[in-house]
Regions:
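Nucleic-acid endonuclease domains
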Residues: 1-82, 89-168
Length: 168
């Protein structure tokens, strides 16, 4: 599913990415947290891409993006719908793969994979439950250690998400 973001969603994503990046920079400088980023992109770019994915998913499933500022990240939960916790993973790699650095980092009920297609378009590739991910993942090393992965083709289409969480 391709979502064309509205200007106000793009602006909100940029705003919240800047707030998160600024807070993280201050806390890192004060020694309160450690930056665990492995990407060669800036913290702002990583947060911005993630928030674009979150806004696309929120619109597609009629949920609200959690923009609360947490001391050391959101713990994985990007939104909650009908009591179900959801983590949105926005992949910026050429191949569409849902990736967790560690298996225990999948600590929500569901994960949804997105990719940035253009400055205002986000593709939602599908979703998977925590249990199914644990049974179907494969490991892959992109040069910085093994990661836990499921290819987009193995995900359920986002159009079936309401059915999966019992809302239909």
């Amino acid at each position: 599913m391709l979502i064309h973001l509205k200007p106000e969603e793009i602006i909100a994503a940029a705003h919240h990415a800047a707030v998160r990046q600024s807070a993280k920079a201050v806390r890192t400088e004060l020694g309160q947290i450690k930056n665990h980023k492995i990407s060669n992109q800036s913290d702002f770019a990583v947060n911005y891409a993630g928030l674009l994915g979150e806004y696309a998913v929120a619109r597609s499933i009629n949920a609200k993006v959690d923009t609360a500022l947490m001391i050391a990240g959101d713990g994985g939960t990007d939104m909650v719908l009908n009591g179900n916790t959801i983590q949105v993973k926005t992949n910026m790699m050429p191949e569409n793969v849902l990736i967790f650095n560690q298996l225990e980092h999948f600590n929500t009920d569901w994960a949804i994979l997105c990719s940035i297609e253009s400055a205002s378009s986000v593709a939602i590739h599908g979703f998977i439950s925590k249990g199914k991910f644990a049974k179907t993942y494969h490991r892959h090393d992109w040069g910085y250690g093994n990661r836990y992965c499921v290819k987009a083709e193995a995900l359920a289409p986002i159009e079936k998400f309401y059915e999966a969480i019992g809302l239909t």
